[in-house]
Amino acid sequence: MSEEKSYCGFVAIVGRPNVGKSTLLNKLLGQKISITSRKAQTTRHRIVGIHTEGPYQAIYVDTPGLHMEEKRAINRLMNKAASSSIGDVELVIFVVEGTRWTQDDEMVLNKLRDAKAPVILAVNKVDNVQDKAELLPHLQFLASQMNFLDIVPISAETGTNVDTIAAIVRKHLPEAIHHFPEDYITDRSQRFMASEIIREKLMRFLGAELPYSVTVEIERFVTNERGGYDINGLILVEREGQKKMVIGNKGAKIKTIGIEARKDMQDMFEAPVHLELWVKVKSGWADDERALRSLGYVDDL
């Protein structure tokens, strides 16, 4: 009896900031793994999400959004991470937003024209397009930009046509042995995922108040005698005023962030979590490449 063939390959999800790349990854995996918020630049590392279905294993790389501004060290590193993801994959999903087309979209497209991998164009947030008559001419405009493998209008938020993307991915995976066991959904450590969950809550609850000068270090991540985890998170900001903002009036803001982060961690780790958070000022970290390296921003470039 012949052994069943297996298929496996890397798939990069690329696009300018805030077009819904992380939401799409979470939908493709069937669970939350990459952080999502309405602010641009929420994804700072390349997250590998793994989806195994029978003989097919797709390994998704969720890149930071490519964008024009490279003034700060952190933005330069994020662009480098996104560009390097494009180079070594079997397939690329290029995510754009509705009928919007910007200079940043153009920049991503130019990088993709040089890439060897076939590109699926996912036109996200089509449910938000007010005038549906604009959609068809825009899709025709997109089709003329490059020879895409396929163009799929989707809503990552509601899941519309995400199964179509998944089917195209499966069809184009090369024959290969699986890189990961079938129950793996990410190659990232639980410690890393804990820091991402806290960072998402910071983005969500502080909104536009807080600039991108915030990051999270997990100082302690241990199993306790109750079969759960004790986690200590350190939130780093650049200025004293930002520290007050994170803590909130009588500690209300950081308490909310902690409660919501703990819920998500318990769902993800399937165990009770005791979480403690502190806030510390570390000025200039987003401008300093050495500081970024020490915080793990460059470990995967």
UniProtKB/Swiss-Prot annotation:
Q: What name does UniProt use for this protein?
A: GTPase Era
Q: Where in the cell is it found?
A: Cytoplasm; Cell inner membrane
Quaternary context: Monomer.
Q: Indicate where this protein is primarily found.
A: cytoplasm
**Any one of the GO CC terms:** cytosol
**Topology within the bilayer:** Peripheral membrane protein
Segments carrying the region annotation (G5) are 154-156
Record region (G1): 15-22
Which stretches does the entry tag as region G4? 124-127
Q: Which domain of life is it from?
A: Bacteria
GO molecular function terms here?
Answer: GTP binding; GTPase activity; ribosomal small subunit binding; small ribosomal subunit rRNA binding
Q: Which family does it belong to?
A: Belongs to the TRAFAC class TrmE-Era-EngA-EngB-Septin-like GTPase superfamily. Era GTPase family.
Occurrences of domain Era-type G (ranges): 7-175
By its UniProt entry, which PANTHER family does this protein fall under?
Answer: GTPASE ERA, GTPASE ERA, MITOCHONDRIAL
- Show the segment(s) annotated as G3: 62-65
Chain positions covered by the region annotation G2: 41-45
| Residue ranges annotated for the KH type-2 domain, each copy included | 206-283
Query: Which NCBIfam families does the record associate with it?
Result: era (TIGR00436), PRK00089.1 (NF000908), small_GTP (TIGR00231)
Upper classification of the source organism reads: Bacteria, Pseudomonadati, Pseudomonadota, Gammaproteobacteria, Enterobacterales
Q: Which controlled-vocabulary keywords does the entry list?
A: Cell inner membrane, Cell membrane, Cytoplasm, GTP-binding, Membrane, Nucleotide-binding, Ribosome biogenesis, RNA-binding, rRNA-binding
Binding of GTP: at which residues? 15-22, 62-66, 124-127
Which processes are annotated in GO (biological process)? ribosomal small subunit assembly
InterPro entries attached to this UniProt entry: G_ERA_dom, GTP-bd, GTPase_Era-like, KH_dom-like_a/b, KH_dom_type_2, KH_sf_prok-type, P-loop_NTPase, Small_GTP-bd
Which PROSITE patterns does the annotation name?
A: G_ERA, KH_TYPE_2
